[in-house]
A protein has these predicted regions:
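Flexible, compositionally biased loop and terminal segments
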Residues: 1-184
């Protein structure tokens, strides 16, 4: 999952937001070729209703085009914020409870997960945070519960294959316990 645009990014300057929208228009069209060439399913997570109609249509076309691919799975977070995702999901679940579709005593962690944008997608194993930042920035807060973190001072535009390999090597050295104790 790539965090392309947060719900908070709308607060940036008009020029920067307009530039990002122009980039999205171009990139979403390129994603169809990327999807086809790699047999990759691409899903956009976040609230796309805030985008211009042409961007929403490009998102729908991309997701429809790639829906049957299953070799690779790629998510792009656009107008995404984890708190917003959880709020939207809980509103849907509350409506289903009110409509009698879900009983409150049936609600589990899996039930909650099924109402999130990432429903049906495994939680990340590794989060790579670039540019020296050491915070989640409202990103996948529910899904990152047992994710391993890798922090690097390298800025995103300069993050290349060698840095990715290093992150994966560090990840492979870790003992993932999912809340358990280290076995001796």
């Amino acid at each position: 999952t790539v965090y392309a645009f947060s719900t908070e990014n709308w607060k940036r300057s008009r020029e920067e937001v307009d530039g990002l929208m122009k980039l999205f228009r171009s990139y979403l069209k390129k994603c169809i070729k990327i999807s086809r060439d790699n047999k990759m399913k691409i899903k956009i997570i976040g609230d796309i209703s805030a985008f211009a109609p042409d961007i929403q249509e490009s998102i729908r076309k991309l997701e429809e085009f790639s829906k049957d691919y299953d070799e690779l799975y790629f998510q792009i977070a656009m107008n995404y914020g984890s708190r917003d995702e959880i709020t939207r999901g809980m509103r849907k679940m509350a409506q289903d409870v009110a409509d009698g579709k879900v009983s409150p005593d049936q609600i589990t962690e899996d039930t909650i997960g099924s109402y999130l944008d990432t429903a049906g997608v495994p939680d990340p194993d590794l989060l790579i945070r670039t540019s020296g930042e050491q915070r989640l920035s409202n990103f996948l807060m529910w899904q990152l519960a047992y994710t391993e973190f890798y922090f690097t001072d390298v800025a995103w535009p300069d993050f290349h294959k060698a840095e990715l390999v290093q992150a994966i090597e560090k990840y492979n050295q870790r003992d993932r316990r999912y809340g358990g104790v280290k076995e001796e």
